C-alpha cells in the first residue's frame, strides 16, 4: 500500500491501521464508516456492498467501501459471524470545530468472543476463553462480556481443555505463549477457533482475588488483559472470577453431550428434539441461559440437588401461585444484559425503562413466594431485592415515550428538573408567540397567505409569493430569494427565534447531562442487580421444572447411598414428546449391588440405543434437580457419563470411525470410576469381525474386573452373550420381537436373556431394498448360520485367547515390513489391553 502523495486524512487512516492489521478498520467519516484498501475489497465481498474508490482519477485509486453509521451493527455482526475482528475508529471531536484533520481514535475492537450487541439469541451465552499452560497442567478461564460471568479452572491435560472449550461453544481463544505450535494448530484448524495472543497477564486484585493458583491467576489475568485491550473502557459489570472444578459436576465430554442431544439435536443443529427443548418453559432470557447451564452441568452434591427438588415440589403443590408467578416473570427483562449496557456506556432510555419495569415486578414475585410460606423458598425470597429507590429514580425521571437516541431530547419527564421545565416553557411559549406574530403581520400587511416557516439554514422566516411582494411591509428584511417566492425576517421574529434556539440548545444539553447522571447512578447498583438477576433466573428455571414435571408426568427421583439403580417404567422424555405418549413403550431397568453390566442384544432399529439414552437422560435430569420420566426412580449419584453411541467419521482430523471409537472407549475405561455410567453402543463395528469381537470382549472384561462402572453395552456380536457364565456381574437382556407368518414386529420392550436373532434382513426390507436382493441375502444367511453351527467363534473363557491371538498374528507375518519398527516401539507393559489392540489395529491399516 503506497503512502506517498496521499491526503492527511488517509495518512491518519494508515497510521491507525498499522496497529490493527488483524482487524477490519471501520473509519468514521461523517455519517458513514469507511473501509479502504484490502479491507474495502474483502468487506465488499463479505458484506455484499458496493466497492468504489477514492481519487478515481489518480493512477492508483484507493479501493473504498462504506456502511451507514446508524445501521453499522448489522454489518459488524456479519463480519463477526464470519470469524473476523472489527476495530471501530470514531471521530473524537466535532468536525465543525476541528482544526485540520478531525481527530480519530479506535474506541473498541469487536471480536467473536467479545461481541455484546449482536443478533445472537439472548438465551445463549457468548463465551470468550483463555488457555495457558504451566508444565503439564492447563489453566482455562472464560467470560461472557454480555452478562459479566467470569470463571476459571485447572485441567489435567490438553484433551480435557479442548473438551471444555467445546462444551462452552467458544469461538475465540486467548492463548498464552506456553502452548505448543501443535496445540495451537489443533485449536485453530481442527476446532476452527480464532486465536488471539496476549503477552502479559493483568493483575486485578478486585476481580482475581488472592485464592487462585498461579496458573489460574495467570490465565484469568491474560483474559482480563485482552478484554480491556479490546474494549478500552471500565467494565464495572464484570463479576469477580469464580473458581470451579470439573469434578464438582457430573462429568460429560463434548461427544457425550452431543450424542445425547442435550442442548440441540445432533442431526439438525436445532433446539427442537433436545433435552433443552423439552425442559424450557422459562419466561426470561436469564432463565433460559441458566437452564442451558444446568443441563450441561448436573450436580453431584446430593444436598444441592434435594434443595432444587424441594422447590419444584412446592411449585407442583401450588398450581395457582405458580401460574401467577409465571405471569409475573413474563414482565422481567434481561437484567444481566441491561447491566452490561450500563457498563459499556450504551444505555438508552428504553433500557432504563425496561429495568424499572422489571424492578416493579419484583415485589409481586416476592409476595407470591411469601404467600406459599414454604421453608424451601426462604432463601430465594430473601434474595429478591427490589431496589425500590432505583425504580423510583428511573420512573420519575425517564419519560415513557422517550426516544432511543439520547441526543434527540424529550427524554426526561416534566417536573423532574425545574430548570429544564423553564427551558421547555420558553420553547412552548415561543411557538405561541410565533403564531401570534404570524396572525398580526398577516392582518397588518393584507397578505392573506402570509405564513411563517422554518428550516435549518434560514431559521424562522415569512414566506411571501412573488405576486404579493408589493405588499411586503418596510420593516421586513430579505433572507432568501427563490424562483416563485422570497423569505423575509423581522427583528421581533429574530428575537423570539434566538430565545427559542437558546432554550432548545440548553434544554438538550441539560437533558443529556441529567440522563448521564441517572446512568451513572444506575451503575452504582450493578452488583445488586446481578444478584437479583441470578435469583430471578433460578426461580424461573425451577418453575419451569415444575411445569414440565406436570405436563410430562414426571416423578421425583430418590438417591441411594449404594450403587444400586432401579427405574420402573422409565421413558425417554424427548422421544416420547416427539412421537406422542400413546406410542411410546416404557422400559424398566435394575442394576443392583451385584450387577454392573447389562449386555443388550436385539435387532437393529428395535430400540437398544433409545433404551441406553433413556437411562442417561434420567440420570442427567435427576442430578439437575428435575423430576424424571418414570413411575419410580431410585438412583446412585453418578460422577460421570461416558458414551459411544453412533458413529461418524472425524474427517477433519483424519481419524476413522474405528479410531474415534477406540479413543472414546479408552477415555471411558481410563477415567471412569465405580460411580460412573458407561454407555457403549455396537462398539467394535468399525473394524474386522474378529478384531471387533475381541476388542468388545476385552473391554467388557476390563470394565467388569477393574473399572466396575455401571455399564450398558449394546452389541451385534451375539457370541458375547456367553460371557454371562464367567462374568458374575454381567447380565444379558434383549429387545423383544414378535415373529408371526414370516412378519417381524419390534416390540421395543427390554426382556431378560440374550436375543437369538438380529433380523437385519427384516430391517433392510423396511428400508425398501429390492425383493430379489433380500431373497439372496436370506439364502446367504442360511448358509452362514449352518457354517457357524460347526465352528466356535468366541473363546470359551478369558484364558482361552487362541483365536484372538491367531487373528493378531496376521500383523507380524511380513518380517520386512517397516511397520515392525513401530510395533517394536510399543511400550506394551505400560498399556492397557485395549490400547494394545487399538494400536495393532491401526498398524494393520498401514500394511
Curated annotation (Swiss-Prot):
**Superkingdom of the source species:** Bacteria
**Region listing for Disordered, in residue ranges:** 788-807
Q: Which CDD domains match?
A: ABC_MutS1 (cd03284)
Task: Give me the residues that bind ATP, please.
Answer: 602-609
Instruction: Tell me the InterPro entries matching this sequence.
Output: DNA_mismatch_repair_MutS (IPR005748), DNA_mismatch_repair_MutS-lik_N (IPR007695), DNA_mismatch_repair_MutS/MSH (IPR017261), DNA_mismatch_repair_MutS_C (IPR000432), DNA_mismatch_repair_MutS_clamp (IPR007861), DNA_mismatch_repair_MutS_core (IPR007696), DNA_mismatch_repair_MutS_N (IPR016151), DNA_mismatch_repair_MutS_sf (IPR036187)
Identify the Pfam families for this entry.
MutS_I (PF01624), MutS_II (PF05188), MutS_III (PF05192), MutS_IV (PF05190), MutS_V (PF00488)
Q: Mind listing the GO molecular function terms for this protein?
A: ATP binding; ATP-dependent DNA damage sensor activity; damaged DNA binding; mismatched DNA binding
Q: What stretch or stretches form a coiled coil here? A: none
State where composition is biased (Polar residues): 796-807
Listed GO biological process terms: mismatch repair
Naming one, the record's GO cellular component terms include: cytosol
Keywords of the record, alphabetical order, are:
ATP-binding, DNA damage, DNA repair, DNA-binding, Nucleotide-binding
- PANTHER family linked to this entry: DNA MISMATCH REPAIR PROTEIN MSH1, MITOCHONDRIAL (PTHR11361:SF34), DNA MISMATCH REPAIR PROTEIN MUTS FAMILY MEMBER (PTHR11361)
Task of the protein? This protein is involved in the repair of mismatches in DNA. It is possible that it carries out the mismatch recognition step. This protein has a weak ATPase activity.
Similarity comment text for this entry? Belongs to the DNA mismatch repair MutS family.
Q: What is this protein called?
A: DNA mismatch repair protein MutS
Q: Gene for this protein?
A: mutS
